[in-house]
Amino acid sequence: MYVALIGEECVGFTYIIPKGAFHGFPYLHIIAIKEEYRDRGIGKALLDHSERIALEMADKFFLVVADYNPDAKRFYERNGYRQVGEIPNLYRPGITEYLMAKNLKK
């Protein structure tokens, strides 16, 4: 787990699973920013850091984002992720998760 701090306050965090369920590639399990600290570049900084860590393990990075969270999906798309699949009912009945991936090699 990696955290973003402002002073001593945790304002966001991210958690990477080194060998996720998607062909053993690293998987971004969660990235979360306190609502009052969003749109300040903290999420981007945590994502960039997560990608640097993932690149030490593999050349691809995976994540899923829920269909009810289009803002998060757009965030990942702006940062080079593309949807590579859909997984209905992965975490909750009636919710589709979009499987997204990014090639980390430039």
Could you describe each region identified by the protein language model?
Residues M1-E36, L47-H49, I53, N89:
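Acetyl-CoA-dependent GNAT
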Residues R38, L63-K73, N89-I95:
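Conserved beta-strand-loop-alpha-helix junction that forms the acyl-donor binding cleft
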Residues G41:
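Glycine-rich phosphate-binding loop
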Residues K44:
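Residues forming the Rossmann-fold NAD(P)(H) cofactor-binding site
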Residues L47, A54-A66:
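Conserved GNAT acetyl-CoA-binding A-motif
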Residues Y76-E77, Y81:
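Conserved active-site tyrosine of GNAT-family acetyltransferases
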Residues P93-K106:
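Terminal substrate-recognition subdomain of acyl/acetyltransferases
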